[in-house]
Amino acid sequence: MKTGIKKVKLHVKKNDMVVVISGNDKGKTGKILRVFPVKGRVIVEGVNIRKRHMKPTQGNPQGSIIEREFAIHASNVKKS
């Protein structure tokens, strides 16, 4: 019986240097920090930076807004 989850073989892997070939960050270069083969997405250093609102916790009672990289589709990058 199939589970419905299909792993996509990607042309890039962790620590590869890549160039973004489409999207808002077109032309930017960076190192791949993380790969998600099931979703076909990658996280590239310094690309697709977004703000993330963190809830207040015991360790950080104020809460905060942090900027971090979010995943982009692997078809939007190529090795450099």
UniProtKB/Swiss-Prot annotation:
InterPro entries: KOW, Rib_uL2_dom2, Ribosomal_uL24, Ribosomal_uL24_CS, Ribosomal_uL24_KOW, Translation_prot_SH3-like_sf. One of its GO terms (molecular function) is structural constituent of ribosome. Disulfide bonds: none annotated. Keywords: Ribonucleoprotein, Ribosomal protein, RNA-binding, rRNA-binding. It comes from the Bacteria. One of its GO terms (biological process) is translation. One of its GO terms (cellular component) is ribosome. Belongs to the universal ribosomal protein uL24 family. One of two assembly initiator proteins, it binds directly to the 5'-end of the 23S rRNA, where it nucleates assembly of the 50S subunit. This is Large ribosomal subunit protein uL24. It comes from Chlorobium phaeobacteroides (strain DSM 266 / SMG 266 / 2430).
